[in-house]
Curated annotation (Swiss-Prot):
Record key words, sorted: Disease variant, Disulfide bond, Electron transport, Membrane, Mitochondrion, Mitochondrion inner membrane, Primary mitochondrial disease, Repeat, Respiratory chain, Transport
PTM text: May contain intrachain disulfide bonds, as evidenced by its electrophoretic mobility under reducing vs non-reducing conditions.
PANTHER family: NADH DEHYDROGENASE [UBIQUINONE] 1 ALPHA SUBCOMPLEX SUBUNIT 8, NADH-UBIQUINONE OXIDOREDUCTASE
Cystine residue pairs: C36-C66, C46-C56, C78-C110, C88-C100
Taxonomic placement: Eukaryota, Metazoa, Chordata, Craniata, Vertebrata
Protein name: NADH dehydrogenase [ubiquinone] 1 alpha subcomplex subunit 8
Motif extent (Cx9C motif 2): 56-66
Length: 172
């Protein structure tokens, strides 16, 4: 029925939250973007194609799981340099990277040595990429209405207007 909205149950919505501040997320953003690229792009593709967030709950859970695993690995292997780095970002006035290059270098070195992750080059994560997915295409990906016939047949005889044209003052 078109007027009834089916909402997901609370069990379907239950996930562990990623409880971090903006400075922590900003400090880890480059490595997070490289490590969780596929789940994030799968989720965004699902959201764009489906136009309904309820249909993308599984992809959203995978994004959340990837983020939690990422921050657990950072905490396990590089907690001290990462804490120094995000604390520096947090205490600079506008959360700018340029004031914290020494801490960033220590963090990047730790991540490279212990996890084997290379910091992506500037602009690498913003390149347009094709996403290979196993999800089937939606039936109507643009959610467009059916188009009317371009030239419908006119029903009945058309009579001229009884009181003349709307643009009468233009014709005299």
């Amino acid at each position: 029925m078109p007027g009834i909205v089916e909402l997901p149950t609370l069990e379907e919505l239950k996930v562990d939250e990623v409880k971090i501040s903006s400075a922590v997320l900003k400090a880890a953003a480059h490595h997070y973007g490289a490590q969780c690229d596929k789940p994030n792009k799968e989720f965004m593709l699902c959201r764009w194609e489906e136009k309904d967030p309820r249909r993308c709950l599984e992809e959203g859970k995978l994004v959340n799981k990837c983020a939690l695993d990422f921050f657990r690995q950072i905490k396990r292997h590089c907690a001290e340099p990462f804490t120094e780095y995000w604390t520096c970002i947090d205490y600079t006035g506008q959360q700018l990277f340029r004031h914290c290059r020494k801490q960033q270098a220590k963090f990047d070195e730790c991540v490279l040595d212990k996890l084997g992750w290379v910091r992506p080059d500037l602009g690498e994560l913003s390149k347009v990429t094709k996403v290979k997915t196993d999800r089937p295409l939606p039936e109507n990906p643009y959610h467009s209405r059916p188009r009317p016939d371009p030239s419908p047949e006119i029903e009945g005889d058309l009579q001229p207007a009884t009181h003349g044209s709307r643009f009468y003052f233009w014709t005299k």
